[in-house]
Amino acid sequence: MEAQNKLQIFNKYFDLIFIKFPIAFPIIYGVALYTLPGYENVIIFIALLTLAEPHFGATWPFFLDKGNFAEIKNRKIRYIYMPIAIILLSLIGFFYANSFFLLFFFAINMFHVTRQSYGICKLYKSNEQELNYQEKIIYFFNAVFFIVGILRFYIPIIDQTSIFKLNIIMLFSLFFTFLLYYFKFKNLENFLTLITGSIIFFPICFVDKPIHGIVMGVLMHYTQYLALTYKVYDKRNYNNLSKQVNNAKFFGIKNSTFLIIVL
């Protein structure tokens, strides 16, 4: 067995709770729905307000950072025109082709979330063989959950009588896949990262409304994104501050010290 990767984004425990295995968030969401069914919309709103919207807004510092202005200016099609076109097409699709738009949105959302899950695995990878296994497992199960979502809510072929059998099959499939993976690589933390990436859309198999299938598991995606974005933002601020300190030096002496000597 190869040595396990010791990379840490923040520290061992923060990484585990918010990036590698943020399972607490969908559990809290599910328990809240079960114990407070009359407040379903409030629970959805709170989840979206506290995690989803900050996750969407976390992208904006990219456009506000002066260091990125040249990149944005040189690639206007990617960073300006395409987002505007997507917004307009989304508005048109939502009002005039709602069913197709929702299906397309579901597919893009799953692809985006799956890509991030694989990216998280790359951050903590121990070796290429393990990463290849993680990629195949994550993409496979998320593709299965996408098909289940279509067959449950878009083309309702899977009815309530089949839900129990479906979940038994999925649970056994996940269990044996994870078991084989763990015995092969024996890396507990990467094993938990794999579980996170593989089960994000598992709620689509048992929730009664598609919104819960999207929000419940994807809360883990939101926390991962926010944690990583904060780290990038914090590192960027640190680098900018270091540059300012270096620029504030005069013949190797900080300006403040120089002024004190002069006075």
Task: Kindly label every feature range from the protein language model.
Residues G30-I44:
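Short, hydrophobic transmembrane alpha-helix segments
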Residues I43-P54, F101-F111, K165-S173, H212-Q224:
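Hydrophobic core segments of alpha-helical transmembrane domains in multi-pass membrane proteins
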Residues I46-D65, V113-S117:
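Central hydrophobic cores of alpha-helical transmembrane segments in multi-pass inner-membrane proteins
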Residues F62-A70, G119-N132, I211-I214, V232-N246:
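A cytosolic-side transmembrane-helix exit/cap motif
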Residues I72, L89-F164:
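Membrane-interface helix-loop-helix junctions at boundaries between adjacent transmembrane segments
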Residues I199-K243, F250-L263:
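C-terminal transmembrane-bundle signature of multipass membrane proteins
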